[in-house]
Amino acid sequence: MTKKTVASLSKSDLSGKKVLMRADFNVPVDNGSITDDTRIRAALPTIQDLTEKGAKVILTSHFGRPKGKVNEKMRLTLVGERLSEVLGKEVKKCDDCIGDEVTSTVAEMKDGDVVLLENVRFYSGEEGNDPEFAKQLASVADLYVNDAFGTAHRAHASTEGVTKYLSPSVAGYLIEQELKFLQGAIDSPQKPLAAIIGGSKVSSKIGVIEALLDKCDKLLLGGGMIFTFYKARGLSVGKSLVEEDKIELAKSLEAKAKEKGVTMLLPTDVVVADKFDPEANTQTVSIEAIPDGWMGLDIGPESAKVFQDALADCKTVIWNGPMGVFEMEKFAKGTEAIAQTLADKQDAITIIGGGDSVAAVEQLGLGEKMSHISTGGGASLELLEGKKLPGIVALDDQ
């Protein structure tokens, strides 16, 4: 998917032009303050490039799930304030995303100004990709930039619908980066390629495991999903999480890996607990010796070492999903060990593919050491699965 990008637009293309830019400002908020502004900062390179080239930037985003009606708690007021701070200039915030107020605010904009529209999901036409709503959103602008990778897997009015009314429609720098690393790792990786897949359920990672079996040399599995694989091997897993209806699938995935010559590694030891609780009693046991009534909540130290050795010669590593219940200190060591191993691998391309593994890496302060940290959860997974993302397909080809 080689798409036209903001970088290809010159000052003469943009000067005085009104640009509708879709960003992903769906940031975590607690007690009336933003707890992590990564997504806001991720949009800055595109916003700054547009304003420096003399464009009038009209920002749009969703926030939370207001289900098509106004929800006072889900207004973008805090986002507007933080944007003004990090951009070092006033960002005017509208109380709607379509209509008279928007039209008159945009009419007063000067070159280089930035305006933030209200939460697009206050209208059901956003998630319904209603052409009339998309047309109204687009009506105030001359061209379109999508830099919201986190929602690129959704065909919504602000990610897909508006492209029918605005030309050119191009990718921002964030989407360009995401495609370069994620698409690059799938289409033309430096080999050997390893994928580390974690998380609690096989069901949510089936697509990505199947797709990666066609691409990678090594597949390392961790997290709660491993117990479904152990059960498929006939092992006793105590009270560990098992998806009974996925046991046959686990067998077939192992068989497929063997058939394709992919090294598929599961942990050899696990940290088990007598209950799902931060204060639980714990012990480290071999996978053949999980006691009845106990549950596995992390990979063990021996497994972390085996995984580390397996990654030693890899030139590209994709990681999606934690190795254990890393939110609880007693079950965080496996995830921490993998994060540290990747941070130390300066001879390889390391891609942290969205979701909880990103949170773990950021918490440990290792983000800077990775080649790429994806801002998309579902979007990253779908791209790694080889699916086409509607928000990207809709953009102009190079």
Swiss-Prot record:
Gene3D superfamilies: Phosphoglycerate kinase, N-terminal domain. SUPFAM superfamilies: Phosphoglycerate kinase. It comes from Trichodesmium erythraeum (strain IMS101). This is Phosphoglycerate kinase. GO terms for biological process: gluconeogenesis; glycolytic process. Its EC number is 2.7.2.3. Keywords: ATP-binding, Cytoplasm, Glycolysis, Kinase, Nucleotide-binding, Transferase. ATP binds at residues 205, 296, 327, 354-357. One of its GO terms (cellular component) is cytosol. Substrate binds at residues 24-26, 39, 62-65, 121, 154. HAMAP family: Phosphoglyc_kinase. It holds the Pfam family PGK. It is an enzyme of class 2 (transferase). Belongs to the phosphoglycerate kinase family. It is found in: Cytoplasm. Monomer.
